[in-house]
Amino acid sequence: MQTRFKKRLIPPPIAAFATTMILAHSSFIPSVYAQATAGKTVSYTETQAVAGKLIYDVSCASCHGVNLEGAAVVPNLSGDGFAVKWSGAPVAELATKLRQMPPGGGRLNEQAYEELAAYILAFNGVAANSNTPPIQLGLQSGYLLPDMTDGRRVAIVSEIAAGAAAVLEKLSPVSDEMLNNPPAEDWLLWQRSYDNQGYSPLDQIDRANVADLRLSWRMPLQAGDNNPGPIIHDGVMFFFTFPDTVLAIDAINGALLWRYQHESDVRASQKKGIALHGDKVFVPTSDLHVLALSAKTGELIWDHEIETEVGLSGYNLRSAPFVVGDKVMQGITSLRIAKGGWIIALDIETGEAEWRFNTIPRPGEPGGNSWNGLPIEERSGGSVWNAGAFDRELNLAYFGVAPTYDTGPLLYPVDIDGINNDALYTNATIALNPESGELVWYYQHLANDQWDLDWAFERQIITIPYGGQTRKAVVNLGKLGILDALDAASGEYLFSMDMGLQNVVSAIDPLTGYKTINPETIPNPEQTRLICSTHYGSKSWPPSAFNPRTNRLYVSLNEGCIEAGPEGYELLTSGVRLAAALNPDSNGNMGRIQALDLGQQQFAWRYRQPSPIISSIMATAGGLIFAGDLNRILRAFDEETGEILWETRLDDVPSSTIVTYAVDGIQYLAVAVGQTSYYVNDWSRMYDLFAEQEGMPINDSPKGGAAIWVFSLPPRKN
């Protein structure tokens, strides 16, 4: 495990900002500044530049500006910022960036990209040279770009610092106490606070005025795979976007303050956010690094590379880091890799590894006898997809663990005394001591999962009346749409609530929570069986919200099933194949919001609609909950009744957690759209099947692309 501290002449995010904005379509930032070199410098012909201008006007000017000046978060391709970043950079890097344009890449031929490069150089003051070979991106990869700076490097730094300082200097250090009980104005974690309740005490936007919400600002983003979770502190929004890029944004108006992009050769993968603690931002990357950045400048402080035994393939960092005290905890997903996933804890100041908890126990360890006698080299899964929850009083961090895809060897138990096929700690809640990584308790919600029906999502810490006492509980739902409540201190089973969308579990023991499996759903490669819920999950990645004032939990659900049998695609190794199927009880609906009274263990209300719910649910003290769907509608509901009080059509699918915050006495509502994920793609396919069967139109109007949308109320009239 390696941790590197990095210092550079110019902090990369500041230099990246300069007088330019962040790139929304592609990252026009070379990976390193070129040192003085005797390498050849590229040149171009006037003919190339003239042709390049025509191509630029047609294909690029609408985003990057007629004069290459950029707009909003689309970068400029000229001027001081561009010159500083690209002077002396390898031609190969410019070629890579150009070939990704327009968004989606590959729309122009190689000659067109060469002519575009020539025009960009010409616009930046580099003279054509007819006595040298024309620019040839494919043949001149070892060449360097010419100097375009004219000694402007120092001026750029001072200009940037002056532009961002006024907002960034207001940032105060984030403490454990703030993460446990954030200032009302802030949204400091993926689900706002350590308890993951997804609830804000802000109430300026309420039932009476929510219909007056209007767009305050919109920032375009680069399209790509992402599950973004904005966090806001002291008027600054920190946003992790595609590809592996952190933005610091003025939360009042959407102005970019700084930007940091992690460069790697690995294709950027979807993430669920970043973390704040002290004066640092903690970032997971697609090539298995965890970074610490300065919250005020974006400067890299340390870089920890997570070591694996078999390289990077098959591993991912999906969740936001989770910080408690002086430990930065990061879950690792391991899809089909021997020995499975784990949680690692890093020292907050140095990035050095402190402890590691393996989610699949080794033979001879507690739980090691639950893998049907398989050697550790044949055990896989146990991914950690989501950030944890933390209770300060109990000093326990709670995580969920995913199942394995290698289900075949576990399907039937072996006849060996002391060996079972439960497959710990898959589908379990694990409670860890954050200081040592010691396992304090665990509870397995569904043993020997043969259907990819994860119980891997957010753990929420709540306090509710139960059995004549006030109990602190950890609650979560799995893909089946069954909620389990456990005692937070001991893991003792309390109760379950079934949303009625599944047929796999036929009975739940009221004392232990043990789930009896319906024998008609056990995988059989020779017989097609209807399995509900789908492995996409009735409950999945979008987190729920809990209102502590009313003891109500608000859950986003989607109704769907699978046919498991001899036809379809092979996800698991039991021999069955899977094909999408509709829920026979859908009655023309697929999306659902369920309100649960956890104090009474009763259903409060239910809202159903045709389109799947795609975003998180967010609750506020204004008596509202918010949710967004696949048809690009963002809605506000009355938390008491489920009545729709406001809705607006977005220009793309709301694919993030919904958050709220306040700056200078004004409450804002924010959501990101247009950055896709497994979840969005899966339910888009399910909805297409559903709409076709139900004869419903599909919203196929042009999409506006990835962006952050922020709403607020109109100014009050005096």
Predicted stretch roles:
Residues 52-67, 116-120:
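The canonical Cys-X-X-Cys-His
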Residues 448-450, 455-458, 498-504, 532-534, ...:
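Conserved blade-ending motifs and adjacent loop-strand segments that build the rim/top face
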Residues 42, 46-53, 67-100:
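Gly/Gly-Pro-rich "capping" loops immediately C-terminal to redox-active cysteine motifs
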Residues 330-341, 399-423, 559-586, 674-700:
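Short, conserved, GDST-rich strand-edge loop motifs in beta-rich repeat architectures
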Residues 38-39, 106-194:
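Flexible coil segments in periplasmic/lumen-exposed cytochrome c-class electron-transfer proteins
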